[in-house]
Amino acid sequence: MNTAGDLFWNNVTEILKDNNKSLKSVALYMRDGVNDKKTLALYDKLYRYKREAINPPNVLIDGVLNYLKKFDKNLMISDLYSDWSEYDAEN
């Protein structure tokens, strides 16, 4: 069964792969391009959420989605994710 976390991370991974980017690129974007220990910690946190296929906190989701908007102005992933979020809220 696909969970909201699976759906979110599968779509994030696909968009990053299509654009030759990685989670480290996302972490650098979220930290304004500063490559320091905090950026590495953020990358580790994102990677752990991805590996465990769980949803990160909303502030991290917003950062990831803002980064992905660079590649897809319509950002279909946010539509899919919001559908799952509504489903989770109802159940």
Regions found by a protein language model. Give the residues of each.
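A short, basic/aromatic helix-end/turn motif that makes direct DNA contacts
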Residues: 29-32, 49, 67-70
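Residues within the helices of the helix-turn-helix
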Residues: 13, 24-28, 44, 62, ...
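N-terminal positioning helix adjacent to the helix-turn-helix/winged-helix DNA-binding module
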Residues: 4, 8, 22, 42-45, ...
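DNA major-groove recognition helix of helix-turn-helix/homeodomain DNA-binding modules
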Residues: 57-78
